From Swiss-Prot:
Residues the record lists as N-acetylvaline modifications: V1
Modified residues (N6-acetyllysine): K59, K82, K144
Organism this protein belongs to: Lutra lutra (European river otter)
Family per record: Belongs to the globin family.
Superkingdom of origin organism: Eukaryota
Quaternary data: Heterotetramer of two alpha chains and two beta chains.
Annotated transmembrane regions: none
Expression (tissue specificity): Red blood cells.
Protein name: Hemoglobin subunit beta
Record PTM Phosphoserine, positions in chain: S44
InterPro entries linked: Globin (IPR000971), Globin-like_sf (IPR009050), Globin/Proto (IPR012292), Hemoglobin_b (IPR002337), Hemoglobin_oxygen_transport (IPR050056)
Keyword match Acetylation: yes
A Pfam family it matches: Globin
Gene name linked to the record: HBB
């Protein structure tokens, strides 16, 4: 991902204020509610029968935290996202058979959740920088697909 120094500073500054537990669960939960076909990858998560069930599901929250912890690693390695996410790309491609389009959807949902949490602090410039990052992460996660 090619970010200016200003964009990198904006992304890392805001990310330092993110509650990974809360935002991760909310982002994954919203993905599963807004794009219900993504639920098929989470059969083992139990009750996903309604928006309230999804948003309150402890397995959704735990996996959302895991996802955002991986995203945090990506932010530390913006110049090598493909390398950072190589193993996760392989896992999601070869073993889990996740549609790589879902990575883009989750990235966009994450941007919406960040905007909701940070309000005026999430300026158009910050959003533009985050859109670049989530697109780069989605591309890195889709890298092993053929």
């Amino acid at each position: 991902v090619h970010l200016t120094g200003e964009e990198k500073a904006a992304v890392t500054s805001l990310w330092g204020k993110v509650n990974v537990d809360e935002v991760g669960g909310e982002a994954l939960g919203r993905l599963l509610v807004v794009y219900p076909w993504t639920q098929r990858f989470f059969d083992s998560f139990g009750d996903l029968s309604s928006p309230d069930a999804v948003m309150g599901n402890p397995k959704v929250k735990a996996h959302g935290k895991k996802v955002l912890n991986s995203f945090s690693e990506g932010l530390k390695n913006l110049d090598n996202l493909k390398g950072t996410f190589a193993k996760l790309s392989e896992l999601h491609c070869d073993k889990l058979h996740v549609d790589p389009e879902n990575f883009k959807l989750l990235g966009n949902v994450l941007v919406c959740v960040l905007a909701h949490h940070f309000g005026k602090e999430f300026t158009p410039q910050v959003q533009a920088a985050y859109q670049k990052v989530v697109a780069g992460v989605a591309n890195a996660l889709a890298h092993k697909y053929h």
